Amino acid sequence: MRTFRLFFIGLIFIMDMSLSSSDQCQQETVRLRAQLKTLEVQVMKQQQELIQTLSSQRTEQLALYQDTFHDLGDHQYRDCAQIFNAGNKGSGFYTIRPMTSPSLVRVYCDMTEGGGWTVIQRRSDGSQSFNKPWSDYQRGFGDLQSASGEFWLGNDNLYYLTSQGDYNLRINLADFEGVQRYAVYKNFKVADEKEFYQLQFGEFSGDSGDSLSGSYHPEVQWWASHQGMKFSTYDKDNDRYERNCAQEDKGGWWFNRCHSANLNGYYYHGAYSAVTDNGVVWYTWHGWWYSLKSVVMKIRPAAFEPNVV
């Protein structure tokens, strides 16, 4: 009898434990469901915020594109100077067709500093790699949609443009301290691919120093001057160096052995002191070991006279 009572008491204890565990499970299930519902609400809210952000960014990009692209209809112009003198005074993207170009070319026209400038290169934030193969430099690459985008207009296009007559090259430079300098070269000309896009330029003026000619120091001119140099990329070495300048300096350029200017070098996000000169370099201003913050290279006919009518 005593054994039966003990068995009965144990059975009741086990049933109580089971009921208690069941209640705990139900409570835990309710708690987890509440947490899951909260997480679902948070995820939906984040998704809506992300969609709104992306939509806003897309709208801003479209607005920027619409604000900076100028549709001139069926009119064709050889460069931005002709566009300016036709009465189009706003900086932005246009299409041109140089005399020997087989197709239309999308360009950015800078209508400041007298107007009529065709921009051929821009560096601003490192968003584009300039360590590109020959074919990319030949046809051009980069962001030709946003007004501050980085790009190279293309060596073929440089040839088409500069074969139309005498052009001046203006280079605007800025460092990370907010200081700006400029260089202007007369008679800027780029040959065709058969001549490896050989570079020619004339007299210098400006406040940045003449890095392209290497004339700042006669002892280095033989290896630092870019006058008459052929264009080189990491996969097509046309420099005078026993190794490959473009490969070492991270960009295509008119290298000698190797350079005193390399505006297509590796973009460093801040001034730097380095053991190599592979940055965005203009020697006569900041030396070989300082990489510049921004660069704009642009050309305009030497005979350009703004039409003020």
Question: Which stretches of residues belong to each language-model region?
Answer:
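Assembly "stalks" and propeptides
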Residues: R2-G115, G178, P306-V309
